[in-house]
Design a protein with these regions (language model features):
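Acidic, low-complexity cytosolic segments
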Residues: 2-19, 29-196
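Solvent-exposed interaction surfaces and binding hotspots enriched for charged
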Residues: 24-26
Length: 196
């Protein structure tokens, strides 16, 4: 297998460095907004990657239709982008006219893997999404509030506290993603070693 990160020696790579995870939500004013990106938050500044993430066909998936696929995959420049869309409860006041009755937030989880590792994408995406939904469903709306508070020029004590709470949630989600990736790749390697 080729090293997906050519400047990093393969033997020094951690399992969570094999993939990139993007957690986003749809904001009625700003569009597709990242909540977190791991392992490298600086990808927010990469216009090419963020353009791809924001136009991924997962955003057009109707998840209320039970016959829809569970996920949508996209291949681009040597990587596979596996994506899942789900809804979480929200108490956030919506800013678009006519959206006051919406009590849910649209969340998109995208997992990027090198194309020669795409066999692992579906299972890993499922594990990460199940764990985020199980452990963070009520907290994701707080994370969204924190991200919106960061955008505001004037930071009130309430918005500063919201940002602080959001950062703590974000760090916990990142730890969950890292642990899930490590555990998953270690279990896959053990299974492969046992059958070799």
């Amino acid at each position: 297998m080729n090293n997906p990160f050519p400047n990093t020696p393969k033997e020094s790579m951690e399992p969570e460095q094999l993939c990139e995870v993007f957690l986003l939500y749809f904001d009625e004013e700003f569009g597709h907004m990242p909540l977190l990106i791991t392992p490298d938050e600086s990808l927010r500044e990469n216009a090419d990657i963020m353009r791809l993430i924001k136009i991924h066909s997962i955003w057009f998936l109707d998840i209320s239709d039970q016959t829809s696929p569970d996920r949508i995959d996209l291949e681009y420049q040597g990587k596979m982008y596996f994506a899942k869309k789900f809804m979480v409860p929200s108490t956030r006041e919506k800013r678009r006219f006519g959206s006051k009755g919406e009590l849910y937030e649209t969340i998109v989880l995208i997992l990027s893997l090198p194309i020669d590792m795409d066999i692992f994408g579906g299972a890993l995406l499922k594990k990460i999404s199940e764990r985020i939904i199980k452990h963070f469903t009520p907290k994701l709306s707080q994370l969204i509030e924190a991200e919106l508070a960061k955008i505001n020029v004037i930071k009130t004590p309430k918005s500063k506290e919201s940002i602080k709470v959001g950062e703590a949630i974000k760090n916990r989600v990142k730890v969950l993603i890292k642990n899930t990736c490590c555990h998953y790749f270690q279990s896959v390697i053990k299974k492969t070693d046992a059958t070799s």
